[in-house]
Amino acid sequence: MGSVSSRGHRAEAQVVMMGLDSAGKTTLLYRLKGYQLVETLPTVGFNVEPLEEPGHVSLTLWDVGGQSQLRASWKDHLEGTDILVYVLDSTDEARLPEAVAELREVLDDPSVASVPLLVLANKQEVPQALSLPEIRDRLGLQGFLGRSWDLRACSALTGAGLPEALESLRSLLKSCSLCMAR
């Protein structure tokens, strides 16, 4: 993977999406690409898609499989990451401790020490979904001193919150002077 770089007049950034299985990473990936809702299967390995919009940094989105047997390889995808997106199933309160533990393990990796974090609280269309303040507190996001982060509500199913998530991603990228200097 690369990092933010300039090729001619274009800048590119590597975005890695991680999260537990069934959090909605692949559906989010294809919705961000502008596709209508697509049926997905559990990701074995990873999916990679470019996201280019005129006037913006070109993004390469890496959707890394979240099944427990694949998580050991997550660290293999971190080198050269410019933004880490952690997708959380807001309706799966039973697996929240597991999601928190996996996120902390990823963030402990030295290769992402200064990489901004965007947490996408997916499945917000479900009435029982955890609220953003509850997710923020349970993930301990306020304790991530020295790291730029944002938390956004979204729904891969309906597309709600995805434009705001993309804008947040771009804002985090712009604010990351270390990323731009790489």
Curated annotation (Swiss-Prot):
SUPFAM superfamilies: P-loop containing nucleoside triphosphate hydrolases. A lipid is attached at G2 (N-myristoyl glycine). GO terms for molecular function: GTP binding; GTPase activity. One of its GO terms (cellular component) is plasma membrane. InterPro entries: P-loop_NTPase, Small_GTP-bd, Small_GTPase_ARF, Small_GTPase_ARF/SAR. The keyword GTP-binding applies. GO terms for biological process: intracellular protein transport; vesicle-mediated transport. It comes from the Eukaryota. GTP binds at residues 19-26, 63-67, 122-125. SMART domains: ARF (SM00177), SAR (SM00178). The keyword Plastid does not apply. Gene3D superfamilies: P-loop containing nucleotide triphosphate hydrolases. Keywords: GTP-binding, Lipoprotein, Myristate, Nucleotide-binding. May play a role in apoptosis. May act as a tumor suppressor. This is ADP-ribosylation factor-like protein 11. The lineage of its organism: Eukaryota, Metazoa, Chordata, Craniata, Vertebrata. The gene is ARL11.
